[in-house]
């Protein structure tokens, strides 16, 4: 499996969508019998690795550190949980080296809930990823929240059957991660701060770059591909689709229902919420409220109802990003790659 397959997969999807729109056809239901290739999905194929994140669209993935938190997330309506050793806020406060969560904890979470379970690995740490794949997690996050083992090289995700999610601050970073095999992108934001400002900035940068890309000529897109260090087919595909060719979630500092709705309004396909839920004093109510606001983001009345479900007095204590030193910023980790 390689990059050409991901391009072919999305071009065929785009062509099918174009044809249906031209013919005025709306697919309300599928055939009684699916083609054999679709009836028996093969683990590790492009269709499975790219298809799994699509089922998370419109939902919330919640960071958890134990079985109890995973149960709260599932009851609140999360589409998946992300298991890690410490919440990003605690990682920031503790300092030192942040590593993959205990395998036993991940397995306990997997056996206690029915929704998908994701887990984080350090940037460039192939063997943490191989361990997670071997125990059967549904997705791996190669995350800057943990301490990178390689600042210049991310994991070659084409070597794995399990899908990966990576963070990005710009279109260039997002396309480089996709070229490496990422099946999902998330804005980096500034995790563990309870401040959504950086997530907003990163989402606007990515969406703005895509908008400008659509107005470029073929020669100009080739120049952009060289500048980004990615295959020109990926740049062309992104321009044609008018969006990233993989699912794009927002993350980093989301702490309230209004934060989640804002990120969806800016173009996110869903949201990751880390410290915002379980560092608050009302985690159960906040989790349910953020799920409601994310799924009903285009209805201000529904988002207002979600906001009524929480109290600002119980929100996590946020961190002013402007007061962080360059060494304290998590978003810059792995940025050289």
UniProtKB/Swiss-Prot annotation:
Protein's pathway: Cofactor biosynthesis; pyridoxal 5'-phosphate biosynthesis
UniProt cross-references to PROSITE patterns, sorted A to Z: PDXS_SNZ_1 (PS01235), PDXS_SNZ_2 (PS51129)
Disulfide bond entries: none
The EC number(s) this enzyme carries: 4.3.3.6
Binding site for D-glyceraldehyde 3-phosphate: 204
Any one GO molecular function term: pyridoxal 5'-phosphate synthase (glutamine hydrolysing) activity
Reaction catalysis annotation: aldehydo-D-ribose 5-phosphate + D-glyceraldehyde 3-phosphate + L-glutamine = pyridoxal 5'-phosphate + L-glutamate + phosphate + 3 H2O + H(+)
UniProtKB keywords: Lyase, Pyridoxal phosphate, Schiff base
InterPro entries documented for this protein: Aldolase_TIM, PdxS/SNZ, PdxS/SNZ_N, RibuloseP-bd_barrel
Function recorded in the entry: Catalyzes the formation of pyridoxal 5'-phosphate from ribose 5-phosphate (RBP), glyceraldehyde 3-phosphate (G3P) and ammonia. The ammonia is provided by the PdxT subunit. Can also use ribulose 5-phosphate and dihydroxyacetone phosphate as substrates, resulting from enzyme-catalyzed isomerization of RBP and G3P, respectively.
Protein name: Pyridoxal 5'-phosphate synthase subunit PdxS
């Amino acid at each position: 499996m390689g990059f050409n397959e991901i391009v072919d997969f999305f071009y065929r999807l785009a062509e099918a969508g174009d044809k249906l729109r031209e013919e005025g056809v709306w697919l309300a239901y599928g055939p009684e019998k699916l083609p054999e290739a679709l009836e028996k999905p093969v683990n590790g194929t492009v269709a499975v690795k790219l298809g799994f994140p699509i089922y998370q669209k419109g939902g919330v993935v919640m960071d958890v550190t134990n079985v109890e938190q995973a149960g709260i997330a599932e009851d609140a309506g999360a589409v998946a949980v992300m298991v890690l050793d410490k919440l990003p806020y605690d990682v920031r406060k503790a300092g030192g080296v942040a590593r993959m969560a205990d395998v036993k904890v991940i397995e306990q979470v997997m056996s206690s809930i029915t929704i998908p379970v994701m887990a984080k690995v350090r940037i460039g740490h192939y063997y943490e990823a191989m361990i997670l794949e071997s125990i059967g997690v549904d997705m791996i996050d190669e995350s800057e929240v943990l301490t990178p083992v390689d600042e210049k090289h991310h994991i070659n995700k084409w070597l794995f059957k399990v899908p990966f999610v990576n963070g990005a601050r710009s279109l260039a970073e997002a396309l480089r991660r996709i070229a490496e095999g990422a099946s999902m992108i998330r804005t980096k934001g500034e995790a563990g701060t309870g401040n959504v400002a950086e997530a907003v900035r990163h989402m606007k940068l990515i969406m703005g770059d895509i908008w400008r890309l659509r107005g470029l000529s073929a020669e100009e897109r080739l120049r952009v591909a060289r500048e980004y260090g990615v295959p020109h087919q990926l740049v062309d595909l992104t321009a044609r689709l008018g969006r990233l060719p993989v699912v794009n979630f927002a993350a980093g500092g989301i702490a309230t229902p209004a934060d989640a709705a804002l990120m969806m309004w800016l173009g996110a396909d869903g949201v990751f919420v880390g410290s915002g839920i379980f560092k608050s004093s009302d985690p159960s109510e906040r989790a349910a409220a953020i799920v409601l606001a994310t799924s009903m983001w285009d209805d201000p009345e529904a988002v207002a109802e979600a906001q009524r479900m929480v109290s600002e007095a119980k929100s996590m204590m946020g961190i002013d990003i402007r007061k962080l030193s360059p060494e304290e910023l998590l978003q810059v980790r792995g940025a050289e790659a």
